Amino acid sequence: AISRSNEAKALGIPMGAPAFKYEKIFRENDVQVFSSNFPLYGDMSSRVMSILSKFTPNIEIYSIDEAFLKFEGFENYDLESYCEEIKDKVLKWTGIPVSIGIAPTKALAKIANRIAKKFPNQTKGVYSINSDEKRIKALKWLNTGDVWGIGFRHAKRLKNIKVNTAYNFINLEDGWVRKNMSVVGLRLKKELEGKSVLDLEEVRSPKKAIATTRSFEGTITDYEKIKERISTFSICCAEKLRAQSSNCNSIYIFVRSNKFQKNKKQYRNGILMTIPFSTNSNMVISKYAIEGLKKIFKKGINYKKAGAIVMGLDSSKNYQLNMFEKENPKHQILMKTLDFITKKEGTGKIKLGSQDLKRIWKMKQTKLSSRYTTELKEIIALK
């Protein structure tokens, strides 16, 4: 499970749980299970973000289902009523319920949002931390591990020194926080104290790493089949690099067996391959990915998952050159042509020799819901 409703959480179904382990609970409680439907999610996310942008010009799209809105110049507005209007509009126009948290800082807004979501009957989906009293009450309520920006490692360290709530955290000395959690942790502390230090990122920064990973429909033992997938994953990363005008100078390849098949031999390994020059070429990135696979592939293993992650990203318009090795300049022209054809004709029309020319690689989506808003043949029919 990568996403769960409140009802599913109440049944004790944890995040990341394999569906086959909970089939009995599914049957007994009429739990509906759906495969990932990224075209639908992406389209609905765009619609929600478009609606939000009509209520303020200052918006940071934080993830596919989260955004920060800045209400600068709204001093004369009743923000709680205004946000109720936003919530109602999103629900009416998209059918998607949202929760809204209002606060003077991003970190406190995340906590307010958590309260709005946790107590829908009391908050009606909107909660404002608009006083010091409410801020302190919220911080005493929230566990340290649930604070936005405090990861598992820091949460464990804080718990060891009896820092169990966000309120305990803000009472730590600034020097200790900076020393043990860096300047990032100190900024978070200031945010929880009500001092805004994290600006809105209205222009999304390019990603610092790009990954393409997949679990296979079954298990695979054949090297050539794994190679085809690694080649395809690395090329997908290269396409994403070009989409954000970036190059990479290294690629990490990994393979792993099925951890749920305890009776089978277990194996997992990965390798970082350094590319001697910055590139976003399908041919170069795929070549180094396959070289990496050769080093870590082991015969006799039932492989269930593999992936490629490109790292060392920089701008393709301004990058460091290597005095001794450089990319074939024809690759840039070829990639532009390839991207043009892909945009016009669709993905998979032109492939490298290391890819299966007949195979269209798809995720396992046996319980896929309809793509109502992006596929004409799947649109809702009214009778």
Model features per residue range: what roles?
Residues 62-66, 103-106, 246-250, 301-305, ...:
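Short Gly/Ser/Thr- and Asp/Glu-enriched loop/turn motifs at secondary-structure junctions
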Residues 69-87, 162:
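Catalytic palm subdomain of template-directed nucleic-acid polymerases
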Residues 154-302:
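DNA-contacting surface of Y-family translesion DNA polymerases
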Residues 1-64, 68, 192:
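Residues that scaffold, gate, or flank divalent-cation-dependent active/transport sites
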Residues 79-143:
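Long, highly charged, low-complexity intrinsically disordered interaction regions
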Residues 275-383:
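Acidic, metal-coordinating catalytic segment for phosphate/diphosphate chemistry
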Residues 47, 51-55, 85-94, 157, ...:
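Generic non-transmembrane alpha-helical segments
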